[in-house]
Amino acid sequence: MRAQLWLLQLLLLRGAARALSPATPAGHNEGQDSAWTAKRTRQGWSRRPRESPAQVLKPGKTQLSQDLGGGSLAIDTLPDNRTRVVEDNHNYYVSRVYGPGEKQSQDLWVDLAVANRSHVKIHRILSSSHRQASRVVLSFDFPFYGHPLRQITIATGGFIFMGDMLHRMLTATQYVAPLMANFNPGYSDNSTVAYFDNGTVFVVQWDHVYLQDREDRGSFTFQAALHRDGRIVFGYKEIPMAVLDISSAQHPVKAGLSDAFMILNSSPEVPASQRRTIFEYHRVELDSSKITTTSAVEFTPLPTCLQHQSCDTCVSSNLTFNCSWCHVLQRCSSGFDRYRQEWLTYGCAQEAEGKTCEDFQDDSHYSASPDSSFSPFNGDSTTSSSLFIDSLTTEDDTKLNPYAEGDGLPDHSSPKSKGPPVHLGTIVGIVLAVLLVAAIILAGIYISGHPNSNAALFFIERRPHHWPAMKFHNHPNHSTYTEVEPSGHEKEGFVEAEQC
Protein backbone atom coordinates (compact mmCIF):
# COMPACT_ATOMS: atom_id res chain seq x y z
CA MET A 1 0.00 0.00 0.00
CA ARG A 2 2.80 2.41 0.90
CA ALA A 3 4.60 1.57 -2.33
CA GLN A 4 1.50 2.45 -4.33
CA LEU A 5 1.09 5.78 -2.53
CA TRP A 6 4.75 6.64 -3.11
CA LEU A 7 4.45 5.79 -6.81
CA LEU A 8 1.30 7.94 -7.12
CA GLN A 9 3.08 10.95 -5.53
CA LEU A 10 6.01 10.52 -7.88
CA LEU A 11 3.70 10.56 -10.92
CA LEU A 12 1.91 13.69 -9.67
CA LEU A 13 5.20 15.55 -9.14
CA ARG A 14 6.44 14.59 -12.60
CA GLY A 15 3.20 15.81 -14.19
CA ALA A 16 3.43 19.13 -12.36
CA ALA A 17 7.00 19.62 -13.52
CA ARG A 18 5.98 19.04 -17.14
CA ALA A 19 3.12 21.51 -16.82
CA LEU A 20 5.45 24.25 -15.50
CA SER A 21 8.14 23.73 -18.14
CA PRO A 22 7.91 25.72 -21.45
CA ALA A 23 6.37 23.96 -24.41
CA THR A 24 8.92 22.15 -26.56
CA PRO A 25 8.54 23.05 -30.23
CA ALA A 26 8.35 20.44 -32.94
CA GLY A 27 11.70 19.09 -34.04
CA HIS A 28 13.37 20.04 -30.80
CA ASN A 29 16.56 18.19 -29.94
CA GLU A 30 19.37 18.37 -27.39
CA GLY A 31 21.45 20.73 -29.53
CA GLN A 32 18.60 23.21 -29.62
CA ASP A 33 18.24 22.84 -25.88
CA SER A 34 21.85 23.90 -25.32
CA ALA A 35 21.39 26.79 -27.74
CA TRP A 36 18.32 27.92 -25.83
CA THR A 37 20.31 27.87 -22.60
CA ALA A 38 23.06 29.97 -24.18
CA LYS A 39 20.48 32.46 -25.48
CA ARG A 40 19.04 32.91 -22.02
CA THR A 41 22.55 33.52 -20.66
CA ARG A 42 23.22 36.20 -23.25
CA GLN A 43 19.95 37.90 -22.47
CA GLY A 44 21.09 38.28 -18.87
CA TRP A 45 23.59 40.95 -20.05
CA SER A 46 21.13 43.05 -22.04
CA ARG A 47 19.76 46.36 -20.81
CA ARG A 48 16.53 46.23 -18.91
CA PRO A 49 14.03 48.98 -18.12
CA ARG A 50 14.76 51.16 -15.14
CA GLU A 51 13.38 49.79 -11.91
CA SER A 52 11.67 52.09 -9.49
CA PRO A 53 13.23 52.50 -6.05
CA ALA A 54 10.16 50.93 -4.47
CA GLN A 55 10.67 47.63 -6.25
CA VAL A 56 12.21 44.79 -4.28
CA LEU A 57 14.99 42.93 -6.02
CA LYS A 58 14.59 39.21 -6.38
CA PRO A 59 16.96 36.95 -4.43
CA GLY A 60 20.13 36.07 -6.30
CA LYS A 61 20.19 39.31 -8.28
CA THR A 62 21.83 42.69 -7.86
CA GLN A 63 21.33 45.99 -9.65
CA LEU A 64 23.67 48.70 -10.88
CA SER A 65 22.68 52.35 -10.65
CA GLN A 66 21.38 54.10 -13.74
CA ASP A 67 23.86 55.66 -16.15
CA LEU A 68 23.42 58.66 -18.41
CA GLY A 69 21.82 56.42 -21.02
CA GLY A 70 18.80 56.11 -18.77
CA GLY A 71 18.94 52.33 -18.29
CA SER A 72 20.19 49.81 -15.79
CA LEU A 73 22.07 46.56 -15.89
CA ALA A 74 20.86 43.46 -14.10
CA ILE A 75 23.22 40.55 -13.45
CA ASP A 76 22.67 37.01 -12.29
CA THR A 77 24.48 35.05 -9.61
CA LEU A 78 26.64 32.23 -10.96
CA PRO A 79 26.30 28.71 -9.53
CA ASP A 80 29.59 29.04 -7.60
CA ASN A 81 28.21 32.11 -5.76
CA ARG A 82 30.63 34.42 -7.60
CA THR A 83 29.35 37.64 -9.11
CA ARG A 84 29.88 38.72 -12.67
CA VAL A 85 31.77 41.93 -13.20
CA VAL A 86 29.24 44.74 -13.52
CA GLU A 87 30.32 46.89 -16.46
CA ASP A 88 28.70 50.08 -17.65
CA ASN A 89 29.64 52.72 -20.21
CA HIS A 90 29.39 56.36 -19.14
CA ASN A 91 30.76 58.00 -22.34
CA TYR A 92 33.93 59.16 -20.61
CA TYR A 93 34.58 56.14 -18.39
CA VAL A 94 33.72 52.45 -18.20
CA SER A 95 32.91 51.46 -14.63
CA ARG A 96 33.34 47.96 -13.23
CA VAL A 97 31.92 47.05 -9.83
CA TYR A 98 33.49 44.14 -7.96
CA GLY A 99 31.60 42.52 -5.11
CA PRO A 100 33.05 41.28 -1.81
CA GLY A 101 33.61 37.80 -3.25
CA GLU A 102 35.72 38.98 -6.18
CA LYS A 103 39.49 38.58 -6.22
CA GLN A 104 39.81 41.94 -8.00
CA SER A 105 38.43 43.68 -4.91
CA GLN A 106 41.44 42.54 -2.92
CA ASP A 107 43.94 43.12 -5.74
CA LEU A 108 42.80 46.72 -6.31
CA TRP A 109 43.21 47.69 -2.65
CA VAL A 110 46.48 49.55 -1.98
CA ASP A 111 47.76 48.59 1.47
CA LEU A 112 49.45 51.70 2.82
CA ALA A 113 50.71 49.77 5.85
CA VAL A 114 53.15 47.79 3.69
CA ALA A 115 53.92 50.60 1.24
CA ASN A 116 57.14 52.56 1.23
CA ARG A 117 56.91 54.83 4.26
CA SER A 118 58.71 57.61 2.44
CA HIS A 119 55.79 57.81 0.00
CA VAL A 120 53.04 57.81 2.66
CA LYS A 121 52.09 61.07 4.36
CA ILE A 122 49.48 61.59 7.04
CA HIS A 123 47.86 65.00 6.71
CA ARG A 124 47.81 66.28 10.28
CA ILE A 125 45.39 69.15 9.69
CA LEU A 126 42.80 67.05 7.87
CA SER A 127 43.19 64.20 10.36
CA SER A 128 42.19 66.45 13.25
CA SER A 129 39.51 68.67 11.73
CA HIS A 130 36.02 68.68 10.24
CA ARG A 131 34.92 70.14 6.89
CA GLN A 132 38.41 71.05 5.79
CA ALA A 133 40.20 70.68 2.46
CA SER A 134 43.85 70.94 1.49
CA ARG A 135 45.59 71.34 -1.86
CA VAL A 136 48.18 68.66 -2.76
CA VAL A 137 50.54 68.59 -5.73
CA LEU A 138 50.89 65.30 -7.64
CA SER A 139 54.19 63.94 -8.89
CA PHE A 140 52.66 63.23 -12.30
CA ASP A 141 50.00 64.59 -14.63
CA PHE A 142 46.72 62.80 -14.00
CA PRO A 143 44.27 62.81 -16.93
CA PHE A 144 40.78 63.58 -15.61
CA TYR A 145 38.13 63.64 -18.35
CA GLY A 146 41.04 64.12 -20.73
CA HIS A 147 42.44 67.16 -18.85
CA PRO A 148 45.94 66.76 -17.36
CA LEU A 149 45.86 67.79 -13.71
CA ARG A 150 48.82 68.30 -11.40
CA GLN A 151 47.03 69.64 -8.33
CA ILE A 152 44.07 68.19 -6.46
CA THR A 153 42.26 69.09 -3.23
CA ILE A 154 41.68 66.46 -0.55
CA ALA A 155 38.60 66.98 1.63
CA THR A 156 37.70 65.44 4.95
CA GLY A 157 34.25 64.59 3.59
CA GLY A 158 35.44 61.52 1.68
CA PHE A 159 36.11 63.06 -1.74
CA ILE A 160 38.78 64.75 -3.87
CA PHE A 161 38.01 68.08 -5.49
CA MET A 162 39.49 68.18 -9.01
CA GLY A 163 38.74 71.80 -9.94
CA ASP A 164 41.19 74.65 -10.48
CA MET A 165 39.10 77.34 -8.80
CA LEU A 166 38.49 76.79 -5.09
CA HIS A 167 35.11 77.94 -3.79
CA ARG A 168 32.75 77.11 -0.97
CA MET A 169 30.65 74.62 -2.94
CA LEU A 170 33.27 71.92 -3.51
CA THR A 171 30.69 69.16 -3.09
CA ALA A 172 28.66 70.32 -6.10
CA THR A 173 30.78 69.13 -9.02
CA GLN A 174 34.32 68.41 -10.28
CA TYR A 175 34.97 65.66 -7.77
CA VAL A 176 36.23 62.10 -7.37
CA ALA A 177 34.10 60.73 -4.54
CA PRO A 178 34.49 57.17 -3.26
CA LEU A 179 32.03 58.06 -0.49
CA MET A 180 31.09 61.69 0.05
CA ALA A 181 29.48 62.19 3.46
CA ASN A 182 29.73 64.26 6.64
CA PHE A 183 32.85 62.60 8.04
CA ASN A 184 34.67 64.13 11.00
CA PRO A 185 38.25 62.84 11.32
CA GLY A 186 38.76 65.08 14.34
CA TYR A 187 36.39 62.95 16.43
CA SER A 188 38.92 60.20 17.16
CA ASP A 189 42.69 60.09 17.52
CA ASN A 190 42.67 56.90 15.45
CA SER A 191 41.10 58.68 12.46
CA THR A 192 43.55 59.72 9.76
CA VAL A 193 43.52 61.14 6.26
CA ALA A 194 46.65 59.93 4.48
CA TYR A 195 47.90 59.98 0.91
CA PHE A 196 50.46 57.95 -1.01
CA ASP A 197 52.34 58.94 -4.17
CA ASN A 198 54.98 56.75 -5.83
CA GLY A 199 55.00 58.41 -9.24
CA THR A 200 52.58 55.98 -10.89
CA VAL A 201 49.60 56.08 -8.54
CA PHE A 202 48.24 58.60 -6.05
CA VAL A 203 46.12 57.14 -3.24
CA VAL A 204 44.03 58.99 -0.67
CA GLN A 205 42.80 56.91 2.26
CA TRP A 206 40.22 57.92 4.84
CA ASP A 207 41.08 55.56 7.68
CA HIS A 208 38.75 54.88 10.61
CA VAL A 209 36.73 58.06 10.11
CA TYR A 210 33.36 58.59 11.81
CA LEU A 211 30.19 60.29 10.68
CA GLN A 212 29.37 63.53 12.45
CA ASP A 213 26.68 62.87 15.10
CA ARG A 214 26.55 59.19 14.06
CA GLU A 215 29.72 57.99 15.74
CA ASP A 216 27.88 55.06 17.31
CA ARG A 217 27.52 53.39 13.90
CA GLY A 218 31.24 52.66 13.67
CA SER A 219 34.22 53.82 11.62
CA PHE A 220 34.66 53.86 7.84
CA THR A 221 37.85 52.97 5.95
CA PHE A 222 38.04 53.50 2.20
CA GLN A 223 40.35 54.96 -0.43
CA ALA A 224 40.52 56.48 -3.89
CA ALA A 225 43.43 55.71 -6.23
CA LEU A 226 44.36 57.91 -9.20
CA HIS A 227 46.54 55.98 -11.63
CA ARG A 228 48.88 57.63 -14.06
CA ASP A 229 47.10 56.05 -17.04
CA GLY A 230 43.83 57.73 -16.02
CA ARG A 231 42.21 54.82 -14.18
CA ILE A 232 40.34 55.61 -10.98
CA VAL A 233 39.78 52.93 -8.33
CA PHE A 234 37.53 53.11 -5.27
CA GLY A 235 38.33 50.60 -2.54
CA TYR A 236 36.14 49.96 0.49
CA LYS A 237 37.63 48.13 3.48
CA GLU A 238 35.15 48.91 6.25
CA ILE A 239 31.60 50.13 5.63
CA PRO A 240 29.76 49.53 8.93
CA MET A 241 26.32 50.65 7.74
CA ALA A 242 24.26 50.91 4.59
CA VAL A 243 25.12 54.04 2.63
CA LEU A 244 21.43 54.57 1.93
CA ASP A 245 20.93 55.11 5.68
CA ILE A 246 23.44 57.98 5.87
CA SER A 247 21.69 61.32 6.28
CA SER A 248 22.31 64.03 3.69
CA ALA A 249 20.68 66.84 5.68
CA GLN A 250 23.97 68.53 6.63
CA HIS A 251 26.25 67.20 3.89
CA PRO A 252 25.68 65.60 0.46
CA VAL A 253 25.98 61.82 0.31
CA LYS A 254 27.05 60.42 -3.06
CA ALA A 255 29.68 58.37 -4.82
CA GLY A 256 31.03 58.74 -8.33
CA LEU A 257 32.69 61.24 -10.67
CA SER A 258 31.78 64.69 -11.94
CA ASP A 259 33.32 67.42 -14.06
CA ALA A 260 32.29 70.89 -15.20
CA PHE A 261 33.52 73.92 -17.09
CA MET A 262 33.48 77.57 -16.08
CA ILE A 263 32.19 80.52 -18.09
CA LEU A 264 32.88 84.18 -17.32
CA ASN A 265 29.94 86.50 -17.98
CA SER A 266 29.34 90.15 -17.24
CA SER A 267 27.30 90.65 -14.11
CA PRO A 268 23.88 92.28 -14.72
CA GLU A 269 24.09 94.09 -11.37
CA VAL A 270 27.62 95.45 -11.91
CA PRO A 271 28.46 95.69 -15.63
CA ALA A 272 32.16 96.26 -14.95
CA SER A 273 32.49 92.98 -13.03
CA GLN A 274 32.31 89.39 -14.22
CA ARG A 275 30.29 86.48 -12.89
CA ARG A 276 31.68 82.97 -12.80
CA THR A 277 29.15 80.32 -13.77
CA ILE A 278 29.89 76.61 -13.46
CA PHE A 279 28.23 74.21 -15.89
CA GLU A 280 28.37 70.52 -15.04
CA TYR A 281 28.65 68.61 -18.32
CA HIS A 282 29.00 65.04 -17.05
CA ARG A 283 28.45 62.95 -13.94
CA VAL A 284 28.77 59.29 -12.99
CA GLU A 285 26.63 58.22 -10.05
CA LEU A 286 27.25 54.86 -8.41
CA ASP A 287 24.55 52.78 -6.82
CA SER A 288 24.97 53.28 -3.08
CA SER A 289 23.76 49.76 -2.36
CA LYS A 290 26.90 48.40 -4.05
CA ILE A 291 29.20 50.18 -1.58
CA THR A 292 29.86 47.47 0.98
CA THR A 293 32.79 46.12 2.95
CA THR A 294 35.60 44.69 0.74
CA SER A 295 33.99 45.88 -2.50
CA ALA A 296 35.69 47.93 -5.21
CA VAL A 297 34.89 50.06 -8.26
CA GLU A 298 37.24 50.63 -11.19
CA PHE A 299 36.83 53.42 -13.76
CA THR A 300 38.70 53.00 -17.04
CA PRO A 301 38.93 56.19 -19.14
CA LEU A 302 37.62 56.19 -22.69
CA PRO A 303 39.25 58.15 -25.54
CA THR A 304 38.26 61.80 -25.78
CA CYS A 305 38.66 64.49 -28.41
CA LEU A 306 41.37 66.22 -26.41
CA GLN A 307 43.84 63.39 -27.01
CA HIS A 308 44.06 64.13 -30.76
CA GLN A 309 46.92 66.45 -31.64
CA SER A 310 46.29 67.00 -35.36
CA CYS A 311 43.40 67.98 -37.59
CA ASP A 312 43.41 64.72 -39.55
CA THR A 313 43.20 62.46 -36.52
CA CYS A 314 40.58 64.74 -34.96
CA VAL A 315 38.07 64.79 -37.80
CA SER A 316 38.59 61.10 -38.63
CA SER A 317 38.06 59.85 -35.08
CA ASN A 318 35.25 57.38 -34.51
CA LEU A 319 34.42 58.53 -31.00
CA THR A 320 30.91 59.00 -29.70
CA PHE A 321 31.73 62.71 -29.35
CA ASN A 322 31.39 65.13 -32.24
CA CYS A 323 35.05 66.13 -32.42
CA SER A 324 35.98 69.33 -34.27
CA TRP A 325 39.34 70.90 -34.97
CA CYS A 326 40.05 74.51 -33.98
CA HIS A 327 43.03 75.69 -35.98
CA VAL A 328 43.57 78.93 -34.08
CA LEU A 329 43.86 76.99 -30.81
CA GLN A 330 45.44 73.89 -32.38
CA ARG A 331 43.00 71.79 -30.35
CA CYS A 332 40.53 68.98 -30.96
CA SER A 333 37.38 69.24 -28.89
CA SER A 334 33.68 68.60 -28.79
CA GLY A 335 33.20 72.07 -27.36
CA PHE A 336 32.18 70.72 -23.97
CA ASP A 337 35.20 70.46 -21.71
CA ARG A 338 37.11 72.70 -19.33
CA TYR A 339 38.42 74.77 -22.24
CA ARG A 340 34.97 75.86 -23.42
CA GLN A 341 35.68 79.52 -22.57
CA GLU A 342 38.52 79.54 -25.12
CA TRP A 343 36.41 77.57 -27.58
CA LEU A 344 33.76 80.29 -27.51
CA THR A 345 36.13 83.25 -27.30
CA TYR A 346 38.04 82.29 -30.43
CA GLY A 347 34.92 81.29 -32.37
CA CYS A 348 36.00 77.68 -32.87
CA ALA A 349 32.45 76.45 -33.42
CA GLN A 350 31.99 78.76 -36.40
CA GLU A 351 35.51 78.10 -37.69
CA ALA A 352 34.98 74.36 -38.03
CA GLU A 353 31.77 74.68 -40.07
CA GLY A 354 32.23 73.77 -43.73
CA LYS A 355 36.03 73.61 -43.60
CA THR A 356 38.46 70.76 -44.07
CA CYS A 357 42.00 70.26 -42.84
CA GLU A 358 43.32 71.36 -46.25
CA ASP A 359 41.47 74.65 -45.90
CA PHE A 360 43.18 75.29 -42.58
CA GLN A 361 46.61 74.67 -44.09
CA ASP A 362 46.01 77.21 -46.88
CA ASP A 363 44.24 79.82 -44.78
CA SER A 364 46.71 82.45 -43.62
CA HIS A 365 44.06 84.14 -41.52
CA TYR A 366 44.64 81.60 -38.77
CA SER A 367 48.40 81.47 -39.03
CA ALA A 368 48.95 83.36 -35.78
CA SER A 369 48.78 81.27 -32.65
CA PRO A 370 46.68 82.48 -29.73
CA ASP A 371 48.11 83.96 -26.61
CA SER A 372 49.37 81.04 -24.58
CA SER A 373 48.83 82.96 -21.38
CA PHE A 374 45.06 82.92 -21.82
CA SER A 375 43.30 80.64 -19.41
CA PRO A 376 39.57 80.10 -18.94
CA PHE A 377 40.11 80.06 -15.22
CA ASN A 378 41.82 83.43 -14.74
CA GLY A 379 40.78 85.05 -11.53
CA ASP A 380 41.44 85.09 -7.84
CA SER A 381 42.39 81.69 -6.51
CA THR A 382 42.81 80.50 -2.97
CA THR A 383 46.38 79.57 -2.08
CA SER A 384 45.98 78.74 1.59
CA SER A 385 46.66 75.21 2.74
CA SER A 386 43.20 74.67 4.17
CA LEU A 387 39.74 75.84 3.22
CA PHE A 388 36.47 75.76 5.11
CA ILE A 389 33.77 73.86 3.26
CA ASP A 390 30.12 74.80 3.43
CA SER A 391 28.00 73.15 0.78
CA LEU A 392 24.87 75.03 1.83
CA THR A 393 26.06 78.60 1.32
CA THR A 394 28.47 80.46 -0.92
CA GLU A 395 30.44 83.63 -0.30
CA ASP A 396 31.19 84.52 -3.91
CA ASP A 397 29.02 84.80 -7.00
CA THR A 398 29.73 81.26 -8.20
CA LYS A 399 26.62 79.39 -9.29
CA LEU A 400 26.03 75.77 -10.23
CA ASN A 401 23.91 75.21 -13.32
CA PRO A 402 23.39 71.57 -14.37
CA TYR A 403 24.16 71.50 -18.06
CA ALA A 404 21.39 70.54 -20.47
CA GLU A 405 21.90 70.39 -24.22
CA GLY A 406 21.38 73.88 -25.61
CA ASP A 407 20.03 75.40 -22.40
CA GLY A 408 21.52 78.35 -20.60
CA LEU A 409 24.86 78.44 -22.38
CA PRO A 410 26.05 81.79 -23.67
CA ASP A 411 27.41 81.78 -27.20
CA HIS A 412 30.21 84.30 -27.50
CA SER A 413 30.82 84.37 -31.23
CA SER A 414 33.09 87.41 -31.26
CA PRO A 415 36.69 86.67 -30.29
CA LYS A 416 37.37 90.30 -29.41
CA SER A 417 36.18 92.06 -26.30
CA LYS A 418 34.73 95.49 -26.80
CA GLY A 419 35.76 98.41 -24.62
CA PRO A 420 35.95 102.22 -24.63
CA PRO A 421 38.55 103.61 -27.09
CA VAL A 422 41.74 105.09 -25.69
CA HIS A 423 42.36 108.62 -27.10
CA LEU A 424 45.79 110.01 -27.94
CA GLY A 425 45.28 112.97 -25.61
CA THR A 426 44.84 110.68 -22.64
CA ILE A 427 48.09 108.90 -23.41
CA VAL A 428 49.98 112.21 -23.75
CA GLY A 429 48.58 113.45 -20.44
CA ILE A 430 49.68 110.29 -18.65
CA VAL A 431 53.20 110.55 -20.09
CA LEU A 432 53.53 114.22 -19.04
CA ALA A 433 52.34 113.44 -15.52
CA VAL A 434 54.91 110.66 -15.20
CA LEU A 435 57.69 112.96 -16.42
CA LEU A 436 56.66 115.70 -13.96
CA VAL A 437 56.71 113.30 -11.02
CA ALA A 438 60.10 111.97 -12.11
CA ALA A 439 61.51 115.52 -12.33
CA ILE A 440 60.30 116.36 -8.82
CA ILE A 441 61.83 113.17 -7.43
CA LEU A 442 65.17 113.83 -9.14
CA ALA A 443 65.21 117.43 -7.86
CA GLY A 444 64.57 116.25 -4.33
CA ILE A 445 67.38 113.72 -4.56
CA TYR A 446 69.78 116.39 -5.84
CA ILE A 447 68.86 118.87 -3.11
CA SER A 448 69.22 116.23 -0.39
CA GLY A 449 72.70 115.36 -1.64
CA HIS A 450 73.82 118.98 -2.09
CA PRO A 451 72.33 121.04 0.79
CA ASN A 452 74.73 123.96 0.15
CA SER A 453 73.90 124.34 -3.51
CA ASN A 454 72.13 127.39 -4.88
CA ALA A 455 68.98 125.40 -5.59
CA ALA A 456 68.80 124.10 -2.01
CA LEU A 457 69.38 127.57 -0.54
CA PHE A 458 66.76 129.01 -2.89
CA PHE A 459 64.04 126.69 -1.58
CA ILE A 460 65.12 127.03 2.05
CA GLU A 461 65.00 130.86 1.97
CA ARG A 462 61.57 130.94 0.36
CA ARG A 463 59.84 128.25 2.37
CA PRO A 464 56.82 129.43 4.48
CA HIS A 465 57.52 129.83 8.16
CA HIS A 466 54.76 127.41 9.17
CA TRP A 467 56.22 124.60 7.10
CA PRO A 468 58.42 122.17 8.97
CA ALA A 469 62.08 122.34 7.96
CA MET A 470 63.44 119.20 6.31
CA LYS A 471 67.18 118.75 6.72
CA PHE A 472 69.12 115.79 5.38
CA HIS A 473 72.21 114.34 7.00
CA ASN A 474 74.34 111.42 5.85
CA HIS A 475 75.35 108.83 8.44
CA PRO A 476 77.76 105.98 7.77
CA ASN A 477 75.66 103.34 9.59
CA HIS A 478 72.16 104.29 8.45
CA SER A 479 70.68 104.98 5.08
CA THR A 480 68.63 108.12 5.69
CA TYR A 481 68.01 110.32 8.69
CA THR A 482 65.45 113.04 9.01
CA GLU A 483 64.93 115.97 11.27
CA VAL A 484 61.41 117.26 11.67
CA GLU A 485 60.80 120.66 13.20
CA PRO A 486 57.29 121.45 14.36
CA SER A 487 55.91 124.82 13.22
CA GLY A 488 56.83 127.75 15.46
CA HIS A 489 59.66 125.95 17.25
CA GLU A 490 63.31 126.14 16.26
CA LYS A 491 65.82 123.88 17.98
CA GLU A 492 69.26 122.55 17.52
CA GLY A 493 70.13 118.94 16.77
CA PHE A 494 68.29 116.24 14.88
CA VAL A 495 66.37 113.07 15.46
CA GLU A 496 67.78 109.88 13.96
CA ALA A 497 65.51 107.22 12.59
CA GLU A 498 66.29 104.17 10.48
CA GLN A 499 64.37 103.98 7.25
CA CYS A 500 62.45 100.71 6.89
Curated annotation (Swiss-Prot):
GO biological process, one term: spinal cord development
Membrane topology: Single-pass type I membrane protein
Region span, Disordered: 22-72, 360-379, 399-420, 481-500
Membrane topology, Cytoplasmic segments: 448-500
Segments of skewed composition (Polar residues): 366-379
Residues making up the signal peptide according to the UniProt record: 1-19
Any Gene Ontology CC annotation: bicellular tight junction
Keywords, alphabetical: Cell junction, Cell membrane, Glycoprotein, Membrane, Proteoglycan, Secreted, Signal, Tight junction, Transmembrane, Transmembrane helix
Extracellular-side positions: 20-426
Protein purpose: Plays a critical role in endothelial cell capillary morphogenesis.
Protein name, UniProt field: Plexin domain-containing protein 1
Gene: Plxdc1
